[in-house]
Amino acid sequence: MIMINSPSYLEFCNISKHFPGVKALSNISFRANKGSIHALMGENGAGKSTLLKTLSGLHQPTEGELVVDGKALVFNSATDALEQGIAIIYQELNLVPELSVAENIYLGQLPTKGGSVDVETLNARAREQLKRLGEDFDPSRPLKEFSIGQWQMVEIAKALSRNAQIIAFDEPTSSLSQREIQNLFKVIRELRDDGKIILYVSHRMEEIFDLCDAITIFKDGTHVQTFDDMTDLTHEKLVELMVGREINDIYNYRSRSLGESGLRIENLEGKGLTQPVSLDIRQGEILGLFGLVGAGRTELTRLIFGAEKAQAGQIYIHGQPISVRSPQDAIRAGITLCPEDRKADAIVPILSVEENTNISARPWNLKLGGLIDFKWERDNAEQQRKALNVKTASLQQAIGQLSGGNQQKVILGRWLSTDMSVILLDEPTRGIDVGAKSEIYELIFNLAERGVTVLVVSSDLPEVLGISDRVMVMKEGAVTGELQRHEFKEQTALSLAMLGNNQAAA
């Protein structure tokens, strides 16, 4: 076993990784140097996550090797890689909320005294690790009492406690506030300056250009190009290299004829709303719902879908009042939801693409005697896969192995299998790269053109303005304004979201 100590470089030498029916990585070669934050970018499914899993010891390369300062590394497990000085900070943090901060940092290496855990030493060591990161919160308290941003610091402290010299970050800012993001960037820069080798995966281009010194671009499991200096690299060139084509207008908005009222809400009240909410969306219309964290957007979709019980108000579908006491009631009425956290609330990761596609369609295809029509399910899943261009090795592949963009397509395909007339999309492109985003937008427009009523919740303001016919803005659980398409201005929407009034238009 090689213990990595102050390495000068990490090199991926002709790395390939094959799964049954899929070449996830093909002949990947590049070098990440000490004193540089090295970005990994590509569309979802380009191979970034597979490469990190190879680096972490979760996957063994089919071909090729990892080299540090001229010496080949061999891992038999993720624990093996960590012991050799390699740590991966994943988007889904590998922590235990019920344990203390200190216990999470030193889990597996707890100091003992007299046959039991030496709590005093444990907390002192944890406090010192947090101090290195500029944090001073109490390590003896349960982790669940702290914010996601502080959880990130705990994960980094955990890596440093094991003397990690190579640290990779996989979409670390997806759940962080702007202040927490800036704090994280400060820590990452300090780690770089301290001699660590840093790899950084993100789909947010503004982060890449703000934080990173070098970049490697992937496409379809292959290495496209590495820039050791990003000075002359533009956003447009990066997108072109990622997707293999120019994307001039990622939204490609197009108007369409609208029908009668598709979804109408009158004076809806419930959890997360501070004032009654009313809205009316026509058939074929795309209504964007914008607001900052805590605005009540997600809470509103959950009330409409029956995931939270409304305290007052009335919902109408095609002008007819309906009673929604549960998601089952909503689905029967033709209301569907793609939730904000698809991994927690929308997919069953260990089940196949076929099974996830048909979860909500099964009540419509039971044979006489209560038997499931498996042929119908196979045919339906294949039909949705083709229609939505889902990239998967087979319909039997576990959905948890797919990229975020392809998971989102499967969720959309699930609802296309039902008698859907209304779809609620909560952060539909979060964690999805620019190429897959354009495909999701195209699917949204196709739904609207079929007469489906669409509500899109997004914290990405350019996205909301790019695809919506109208935009409704919320702040602290209340609607603060509505904009028609000819009124769309970022300043106006932000003013409504932050101040609760349209000062930008004054």
Curated annotation (Swiss-Prot):
Please tell me whether the keyword Endoplasmic reticulum is annotated for this protein.
Answer: no
Q: Which domain of life is it from?
A: Bacteria
What's the Enzyme Commission number for this chain? 7.5.2.12
User: Which key words tag this protein in UniProt?
Assistant: ATP-binding, Cell inner membrane, Cell membrane, Membrane, Nucleotide-binding, Repeat, Sugar transport, Translocase, Transport
Topology in the lipid bilayer: Peripheral membrane protein
Where does the chain bind ATP?
42-49
Catalysed transformations (reactions)? L-arabinose(out) + ATP + H2O = L-arabinose(in) + ADP + phosphate + H(+)
- Under which main EC class is this enzyme filed? translocase
- InterPro entries, alphabetized: AAA+_ATPase, ABC_carbohydrate_import_ATPase, ABC_transporter-like_ATP-bd, ABC_transporter-like_CS, P-loop_NTPase
Similarity annotation: Belongs to the ABC transporter superfamily. Arabinose importer (TC 3.A.1.2.2) family.
Q: What is this protein called?
A: Arabinose import ATP-binding protein AraG
Q: Which organism is it from?
A: Vibrio parahaemolyticus serotype O3:K6 (strain RIMD 2210633)
